[in-house]
Amino acid sequence: MKLNFAATALLIGIFTLGLFCPAAVTAAPRVKHVFIISFDQGNPDLIQKSAMPVLHELAATGARTWSAYTVVPSITLPAHTSMLTGVGPQAHQVLWNDYIPSNGLVKIPTIFSLAKEHGLVTAMFVGKEKFKHLLLPGSVDAFVWPHPESDAKAVAKAFAAQVATLKPNLCLIHFLDPDTAGHKYGAQSPEKMRALADCDAALKIVRDAIAAAGLAGSSVIILTADHGSHDIINPAGKSVGTHNTAETEDVKIPWVAWGQGVKKNFTITAPVLQYDTAATALWLLHLPLPDYFWGRPVTSAFK
């Protein structure tokens, strides 16, 4: 059967539209909200042994690996920068670990700035001032550092007070307590385990606030850490926690996903690296991954 010219042109037009029209190929986001919760110095082995019923429930009913890996240097600011830019320290060049205003801001886009390019709402609730180095102009709608009370409970309460109004599409929540306790009392100390338990109570505040805001059914929560730690004996002869090496105790971190579209009771066997969190967040929100990204979405964790 022969097609006339008009019919042929129509078919070609439909085919071309399907291939090349952005409106035709742009899919809806897999979720509307991604909450990344980072436990500073969150050794996965200690987390599994600590009194953390909320986190353990999310891990058991979601997807998890207790053997994800962070970057080197395994310290807070470089690691979180990788978590939020999708590249390693060699690329983002944030190699310091204090708030040093003269060092300026990260030189490459964060996932917050990429999200803002697509009109999304972004937020950061953090326990340390050094995160200001990641505040690219116009990239974060709400940045909250509840100084001087910046422990996990204070951060969680600040989040709970604003989440229903903000309804952020992309949000980082950072709990500093394990790092504080680990450095002072030891990487595996009872004090650090209590700090992790305090973080779990804060996690409950966050989870309940997400639900109360009506966002639970359209959200994914990612639970992870910047680094682990190990013990050393300080000059006073006391065992204290430290990190910043490539040793397993310092670089192994947890990675848990829970929420809409996450596989139930699933063990992630594929390798997960620190910068994969950035890629996973963009993938969930159906935002394009930059070509320069090192990270790749942890797609195996999702249905």
Task: Pin down the residues of each PLM region.
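Bacterial N-terminal signal peptides
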Residues: A9-F20
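Boundary at the C-terminal end of the N-terminal hydrophobic targeting segment
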Residues: A23-A27
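Metal-dependent active-site segment of extracytoplasmic phospho-/sulfohydrolases and closely related
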Residues: F35-S38, V54, D198-G241, A281
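Extracytoplasmic/secreted cell-surface and envelope-processing proteins
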Residues: D45-Q48, K132-L136, D179-Y185, H230-N234, ...
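Substrate-binding rim/cap in mid-to-C-terminal beta-strand-loop elements of soluble/periplasmic
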Residues: L84, T242-H286, T299-F302
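Active-site His/acidic residue clusters
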Residues: H133-V140, A160-A201, I205
